[in-house]
Amino acid sequence: MNTTVSCELHLRLVVSSESSLPVPAGLRYDTADPYAVHATFHTGAEETVEWVFARDLLAEGLHRPTGTGDVRVWPSRSHGQGVVCIALSSPEGEALLEAPARALESFLKRTDAAVPPGTEHRHFDLDQELSHILAES
């Protein structure tokens, strides 16, 4: 049986060193896809942007800078609060988001309870994933 862990977060989109905008976001973790965290960023009334992150990347980013390429994550402070910075890069543009560190850590602890780190392979159905990929081609 698959378990889903989700949470809603209030992120900040960093526009400049003096300015940021609120970005409501949802994180979702499904034990059927144990390596990934799916993020939905609500960028407008009806608009959303979706990204998929490695759970390990977010967990490591709580404590130290990590990631290369399209996604980089690191701990920081903003207005006296612990935040996790998430830098996203794609052909469509770049964004720097700040997530509240405590809320992200709480979410990740709940994912760890669902699938302890290092045991993801026990929850990953390779045959199902290959069937899905082959069906798309």
Swiss-Prot record:
Induction per the UniProt record: Transcriptionally regulated by stress-response sigma factor SigH of RNA polymerase. Transcriptionally regulated by BldD.
Name of the protein described by the UniProt record: Sporulation-specific cell division protein SsgB
GO cellular component, one term: divisome complex
Subcellular location: Cell septum
Disruption phenotype: Does not sporulate as evidenced by the white phenotype of the aerial mycelium compared to the wild-type gray. Produces long non-coiling aerial hyphae typical of developmental mutants arrested in a very early stage of aerial growth. No effect on vegetative growth or production of the pigmented antibiotics undecylprodigiosin and actinorhodin. Aerial hyphae occasionally undergo typical coiling indicating that mutation also affects later stages of the development. Aerial mycelium does not septate into spore compartments. Increased levels of actinorhodin production.
Gene3D superfamilies per UniProt: Sporulation-specific cell division protein SsgB
Gene behind the chain: ssgB
Quaternary structure, from the entry: Interacts with SsgA. Interacts with FtsZ (via N-terminus).
Keywords: Cell cycle, Cell division, Septation, Sporulation
Superkingdom of this protein's organism: Bacteria
Family: Belongs to the SsgA family.
Transmembrane segments: none
InterPro entries associated with the record: SsgB, SsgB_sf
Described function: Involved in sporulation-specific cell division. Required for early stages of sporulation. Important in the process of growth cessation prior to sporulation-specific cell division. Recruits cell division protein FtsZ to the future septum sites and tethers the contractile ring structure (Z ring) to the cytoplasmic membrane during sporulation. Stimulates polymerization and filament length of FtsZ in vitro.
BP term (GO), one: hyphal growth
